[in-house]
A protein has these predicted regions:
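Generic low-polarity alpha-helical segments
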Residues: 2, 88-95, 118-121
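Conserved acidic, metal-coordinating active-site core of Asp-based
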Residues: 102-129
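Short glycine-rich anion-binding loops that position phosphate/pyrophosphate groups of nucleotides
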Residues: 11, 68, 123
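Residues embedded in well-ordered beta-strands
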Residues: 3-5, 61, 69, 117
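Active-site phosphate-binding/coordination module
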Residues: 17-108
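Short amphipathic alpha-helical segments, especially helix-boundary/capping motifs
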Residues: 1-4, 22-25, 119-127
Length: 129
């Protein structure tokens, strides 16, 4: 059986959005006859929202958080235990405090298994101003 690896954001779905409803039946059928793997920078909860639990659990394996949190269906088969060092977190907060970028919206430091997402604007921020 052939193996297929798909990125989620910007490939299967528009970035941070849900998969197209009319694409779901085709993709689910495709998963049933192929070994399908998903790879995403997002966490499991966000990926569930984007591709639906049915698609998520039908995949052979899903690599969340850039491969730092891995699932086979509902079973967590790997999770990186790395944590953001306090010194690095302080540095990021200083960068945020001293940035001249005027807009602030949303979460600036998002800790995930095995990595961290940092944004001056903030997660959930709107760049269309």
């Amino acid at each position: 059986m052939k193996k297929y690896i798909f990125d989620v954001d910007g490939t299967l779905t528009p970035s941070r959005k849900m998969i197209a409803f009319d694409f779901l039946p085709f993709f689910y059928e495709f998963i049933q006859s192929n070994d399908v793997y998903l790879v995403t920078g997002s966490d499991r909860e966000k990926t569930y929202e984007q591709v639906t639990p049915g698609i998520y659990n039908a995949c052979k394996r899903v690599y969340n958080c850039s491969g730092s949190d891995v699932y086979e269906g509902d079973v967590n088969v790997y999770r990186d235990t790395w944590e953001l060092p306090k010194k690095v977190e302080r540095f990021l907060r200083c960068e945020l405090d001293f940035s001249l970028f005027p807009l602030r919206n949303g979460k600036h430091i998002e800790k995930r298994p095995g990595n961290v997402n940092f944004s001056i604007l903030g997660r959930g921020g709107d760049i269309n101003f």
